Amino acid sequence: MRTGAVSRKTKETEIEVAVDLDGRGTAHISTGIGFFDHMLEQLARHSLIDMTIKAKGDLHIDDHHTVEDTGIALGQAVRQALGDRAGITRYADVLLPMDETLTRVAVDVSGRPYLVFRTHFLRDKIGTFDTELVREFFQAFTTHLGANIHVETLYGENAHHISESSFKGLARALRVALTLDPRQLGEIPSTKGVL
């Protein structure tokens, strides 16, 4: 079983995350931030990673700490579930359309964290959600998973569509990259012999 569970408690947030990489995309998400819950549900559904995420944060200040700390805990849980990463496909990329928006996402689950985020929003908010927090989530998730992730919106106008295509693009790329390759089961997908 490729599962991981992380509890993270700070003075700002309390986060509990559990994942099953070989799931069916079932999501039980509660962060107190409606739009963010919707994005995380898309991430679970389209990656086929079962996710349970319960977060309580200092939302009376703003959403930043809750979004960032959820990204940290989710990245750590997926990293834990991967173990030594033996047998994974490792690389994947996807072009994800959503109405007028097209986003490209490429991932290398290498153990080396690096985010390239070339996505720009024409609005500062989606409802009450700050659009700058999309990047904050991706940065935290990338760093704590230990992956190289590139997100680039080629074109688009609607902020909701840009955000959702980024999350769905990540999901579809992870769905491939985290899949076990039957031709290299038990093998580390690197000439170094370690990731």
Curated annotation (Swiss-Prot):
Reaction catalysis annotation: D-erythro-1-(imidazol-4-yl)glycerol 3-phosphate = 3-(imidazol-4-yl)-2-oxopropyl phosphate + H2O
Pathway of action: Amino-acid biosynthesis; L-histidine biosynthesis; L-histidine from 5-phospho-alpha-D-ribose 1-diphosphate: step 6/9
EC class (word): lyase
Alphabetical list of InterPro entries matching this protein: IGPD_sf, ImidazoleglycerolP_deHydtase, ImidazoleglycerP_deHydtase_CS, Ribosomal_Su5_D2-typ_SF
Keyword Iron-sulfur: no
Main localization category: cytoplasm
MF GO annotations: imidazoleglycerol-phosphate dehydratase activity
UniProt cross-references to HAMAP family, sorted A to Z: HisB (MF_00076)
Name of the protein: Imidazoleglycerol-phosphate dehydratase
